[in-house]
């Protein structure tokens, strides 16, 4: 149930209120830089159609075009946007440079940070709250499965096709600080240098075993960046010395989510790896611990260049890396980046970058409305009320903490019984006659 219809500060639809968050100058500058020229279907109209497709999870070109045609008057009020036609929309996705959507995303991110500094502020919780003065980044990638018969440009392995989204996520605000969309044929470590170019001295990087490349780790250490990566079993290490570990109390052993087993100082054993990791005298720290994952305790080993933090801190930092996996799961559940409305590379990139933009706008709405429930539920409410004329922030605030919108729907007048469409009551016509 939704709140009763009362006077609000706006007569705009929820859909228009969300779109109005994007300043027109950002779209104009991005279109100019990418040299997108058009006579009728403007870059703003193109971006608006893709945002609607993401926000409502529409699965086809016809779905977007039919919705725009059904609400043609409302669509035109959004800064004079043109209603998309199927062929025009498809050609724009195929031919226009998706760099425009990427520029709009990053500049919109900067705009929201200036508009509401608390939106992008660092908010570490729990064990990581001790790192208030350090930025913690999680590096990972997510594979987007495609069909080889349709997406032949994205051939992955022998009989598969896939695209890949590389992400450097700031764990303080759970927002991306770097992203690349490309075909999945490249290994994750190929984009590691570019994805971490914005890290500063004193920052912390956590990554999985795909990024355990000693040449890459050496470059991070030389820049003063602390890293925590998972050890690969095929990498041979030579133990130099063992460090003492704290033993948990008997009563807390079963409740602990991290239990340290070993803490050792190691060197790369193979000549090739030792040559690649020449910084810090080739000395590394290897922490082995049992970490809770999906309700089970798994033994994992981590490599780091920090010799001062406790072994439990190293393990807890790696546990924080799962925040980027939560981000990918959240993105795929709320935005349309599994079923694509175009087959070529440009169309896929347009849709992925627009999905990231819509996800960021929804995150902003969650922040300003102080939403207390799951993110997928917020996306569902916004999707269901896209054409409702309500203040979108007041609508989300009305759900409160109990999960039910304050104020119910009350029946004002019932003139006659209501029947299902195309059905009549039993006694509506003469009995025993055809027709």
What residue spans do the PLM features occupy?
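Major-groove recognition helix of helix-turn-helix-like DNA-binding domains
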Residues: 77-96
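Extended, structured, electrostatic nucleic-acid-contact surfaces
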Residues: 69-79
